[in-house]
Amino acid sequence: MRKIGGLKEATFCESVEAGHSSHGDQADIAKKLGITKPSVRMDSQAKYASIARGAGDVYLRLPTSKSYQEKIWDHAAGDLIVKEAGGMVTDVRGDKLDFSVGRTLQNNSGVVAAPKELHGEVIEAVKSVLGAKA
């Protein structure tokens, strides 16, 4: 992971498809954190590798509906890659991703990946913006 002085220097990685993550909520979170750089938008879960290698700093996959459950195969490898690079991956509530309950992350809501030292600040901003949606 890239070493940054704080979240104001961070770059988001996000999905190209608005149906995969709430771009509006993500923009509100960026504003709350003081992030002004344009997001790196890409398809696939290569976003995890992008974060791990330092091409981005924060990956948010924000729920677009309460009923949607992420698939474990979309996130298991990325979770490991980011952790091994020194980052942290949780859901939008700050809970670790639970890969033990079947094919989906049914105990989780969304995904947040960020450097360990900045992850808590990102989670607080996510909770503030999402409120009852999370």
Question: Where does each model-flagged region fall?
Answer:
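An extended, acidic
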Residues: R2-A134
